[in-house]
């Protein structure tokens, strides 16, 4: 084996020379230079400085402006809440551990950090599934004149949390486990060892199939149907130009969120799957560290996309920041993507 396995860790470094120490007890500077750990800490500090204000602002602006409290926005706000969980439960912990060069909070802290990171990522993925289904139901009308209302949005939010917990909670109760990964300063699911005591392999397969592949299949199916329906409706001019424009805007926004999610999480998922299928092979700590830390940017990009592509929310945000005045002079009451859940676009 090209790594060293302990009772609650796996270090991707052979202990033939006797230098390997538990990532819960001693700095891991034999894995990487101290300055590299400092770079990780600086990166986490940047994500905290960006992730907390922009997600908190998303929640605050919505509370301040009643017009933003639409069913579709409930799902988008759910993403902001999940991102804040990642910032407080994961990023702050990883910042501190990176400064020390090892996971100073012990196995319990590792469980909490891994749980919050997994929970946030899964809430984001299942929120995108709910958004994709909402777009499919609203635009393609498979259920006649069904309207996506507040109760449906609340059920959608509850669904995302149930599914996310179904992925993040089992390692806390004995099905798989959370262990330090990469440079041993952040924690994630154990892809590295079979660890028969916790039936680790069965959980990893379950997670990849149920909590990654199936959601992506649903998302791609919904948007494939949606693109076809919108083109057909536009060709037959079934809707007004204003309605079609609004539907295209909200659909474009959600599709960009999906693309951003894939850019952030596919490298991590790909590396994790490779490690899982090549357990014991030779790979360095950087191999998992880079995609793991890159995936954490997901806590920043969703609100940025939302703010950039939603004119009404952007205007409300500017009004809030400028103490009730909007220097841009845009009309907040204009038709926007956040109010398109009552769309009447129908299939051909």
Curated annotation (Swiss-Prot):
A motif ('Ionic lock' involved in activated form stabilization) lies at residues 134-136. One of its GO terms (biological process) is gene expression. A lipid is attached at residues 322-323 (S-palmitoyl cysteine). The record marks 113 as: Plays an important role in the conformation switch to the active conformation. Keywords: Acetylation, Cell projection, Chromophore, Disulfide bond, G-protein coupled receptor, Glycoprotein, Lipoprotein, Membrane, Metal-binding, Palmitate, Phosphoprotein, Photoreceptor protein, Receptor, Retinal protein, Sensory transduction, Transducer, Transmembrane, Transmembrane helix, Vision, Zinc. The modification Phosphoserine is found at residues 334, 338, 343. Disulfide bonds join 110-187. The modification N6-(retinylidene)lysine is found at residue 296. PROSITE patterns: G_PROTEIN_RECEP_F1_1, G_PROTEIN_RECEP_F1_2, OPSIN. One of its GO terms (molecular function) is arrestin family protein binding. Homodimer. May form a complex composed of RHO, GRK1 and RCVRN in a Ca(2+)-dependent manner; RCVRN prevents the interaction between GRK1 and RHO. Interacts with GRK1. Interacts (phosphorylated form) with SAG. Interacts with GNAT1. Interacts with GNAT3. SAG and G-proteins compete for a common binding site. Interacts with PRCD; the interaction promotes PRCD stability. Forms a complex with ASAP1 and ARF4. Forms a complex with ASAP1, RAB11A, Rabin8/RAB3IP, ARF4 and RAB11FIP3; the complex regulates Golgi-to-cilia rhodopsin/RHO transport in photoreceptors. PANTHER family: OPSIN. This is Rhodopsin. It comes from Bos taurus (Bovine). The lineage of its organism: Eukaryota, Metazoa, Chordata, Craniata, Vertebrata.
